Swiss-Prot record:
Gene Ontology CC annotation, any one: cytoplasm
Xref: Gene3D superfamilies: Endonuclease/exonuclease/phosphatase (3.60.10.10)
UniProt KW keywords: Cytoplasm
Stored SUPFAM superfamilies: DNase I-like
Organism: Salmonella typhimurium (strain LT2 / SGSC1412 / ATCC 700720)
Gene: yafD
Main localization category: cytoplasm
GO function terms (MF aspect): catalytic activity
Protein name (record): UPF0294 protein YafD
Signal peptide (UniProt feature, chain positions): none
Length: 266
């Protein structure tokens, strides 16, 4: 699906820019000169949320209350309505969205809002075999204060498929990206891991990529068939805090995680 795969970048005061996938992995960290780091603090705050195409009331107040202090907001099913684009460009230096499929007015897909300009951007898409709808993922890279580069992977996994072949196939290009990156990584989103085979495929992938799972003590994540759908995985960072915000503003609850980019846990 490379032909129709691209990201749209929204920056305040500038026209939206279409970004195509890079030609090679060599461009990771070399595509653009590193600008301001993602965070000048000793912590990185992220919000991860399937926003349900902003179909419910209060989604904007949740973003305003909990997203504006985050360095990264990873949204799934984000529809580029004027309200969302305005919030994104008013509060973040960059907002990158991969349109999974185009609705009559506004494209919907994963969208990453960031407090720094990415130095690398790679959009990915995979088509669901049954409904023929596409799900998207986005790989972006940001400079950290300690000169390391943080790779961020925003994922909305395919939902309707027989077996796990297509599910695993969507993870393959993500794995290629992570394997070519030596620095810290955050991979998060709606993984639609509602069956044991899907859960096993996801955990196997995380192990192969040396990613740890963020644990939530009061685990109020959205579930299907008793299994959580939303996850945050990481490497090369420490987890300071992790919580789930209970809200009716979407059919998923947002995940809030604070990392410190100091020496990783052994």
């Amino acid at each position: 699906m490379r032909k129709n795969t691209y990201a749209m970048r929204y920056v305040a005061g500038q026209p939206a820019e279409r970004i195509l996938p890079p030609g090679s992995f060599a461009s990771i960290g070399q595509a653009l000169p590193a600008g301001e780091p993602l965070s000048n603090e000793e912590r990185i705050r992220i919000l991860v949320w399937n926003i349900f195409k902003q179909q419910r009331a209060e989604w904007l107040s949740v973003l305003k209350n909990y997203g504006k202090d985050a360095h990264l907001v990873l949204l799934q099913e984000a529809q580029t309505t004027p309200e969302l684009v305005q919030f994104a460009t008013a509060n973040y230096l960059a907002a990158d969205q991969v349109p999974a499929f185009v609705l009559p007015q506004h494209p919907s897909g994963v969208m990453t809002l960031s407090a720094a300009h990415p130095v690398y951007c790679c959009p990915l898409r995979e088509r669901e075999p049954i409904l023929r709808l596409a799900k998207s993922a986005l790989v972006t890279v940001y400079p950290l204060p300690d000169t390391r580069l943080l790779m961020v992977v925003n994922v909305h996994a395919v939902n309707f498929s027989l077996g796990v072949d297509v599910y695993s196939k969507q993870l393959l290009p993500i794995g290629d990206q992570i394997a070519h990156h030596s620095g810290p990584v955050i991979m998060a989103g709606d993984f639609n891991a509602w069956s044991r085979p899907r859960m096993n495929a996801l955990y196997r992938f995380a192990r192969e990529m040396s990613l740890r799972q963020v644990r939530f003590t009061d685990d109020q994540r959205r579930r299907a068939f008793g299994r959580p759908l939303d996850f945050v995985f990481y490497r090369g960072l420490n987890v300071n805090e992790a919580s789930v915000l209970v809200t009716r503003a979407s059919d998923h609850n947002p995940l809030l995680v604070e990392f410190s980019p100091g020496k990783p846990e052994q």
